[in-house]
Regions:
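C-terminal "cap" of GNAT-fold acetyltransferases
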Residues: 33-46
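Vicinal oxygen chelate
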Residues: 2-10, 28-31, 38-40, 55-128
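Short, charged/polar, Gly/Pro-enriched secondary-structure boundary elements
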Residues: 44-48, 109-111
Length: 128
């Protein structure tokens, strides 16, 4: 069953580019002159929808993305080059062998770059 998570944005095109490049996904649909843009690998799973809104983000997100990566340094450099911010520069969090870095996209929405513990696969539950 398809599912959407909607992320508000004052200026969706830069975030569309950011998340497409970070997740190696593509624009699946865009309508109402770009007010809504859905991103994903296909239309079957979870898709991110960027929704244009007039107001800027205020406060911490109540939910965030964990982008699962094979290693942390390359994706961190890529995210920074695409306009992300490392929220705790130089800090890597760790719990039970899992590691993550807290980041923010170009509009300040929090996400984590997440490295699975050795021997775990992408289906394992996340500890944070």
């Amino acid at each position: 069953m398809p599912a959407y998570i909607v992320l508000d944005s004052q200026d969706p095109p830069p975030l569309v580019d950011f998340y497409c490049q970070m997740q190696d996904v593509e624009v699946l649909l865009s309508y109402d002159d770009g007010r809504y843009t859905a991103l994903g690998a296909n239309r079957e799973g979870l898709m991110i929808v960027l929704q244009r809104v007039p107001e800027a983000k205020t406060g911490k997100n109540r939910a965030h993305f964990d982008l699962v990566v094979d290693e942390l340094d390359g994706p961190t450099e890529k995210a920074l080059a695409l306009g992300a911010t490392w929220l705790e520069p130089g800090q890597t969090q760790e719990l039970m062998g899992f590691q993550w870095r807290c980041m923010a996209d170009p509009e300040g929405n929090e996400f984590c770059l997440y490295l699975m513990a050795a021997g775990m696969n992408n289906d394992a539950p996340l500890p944070h």
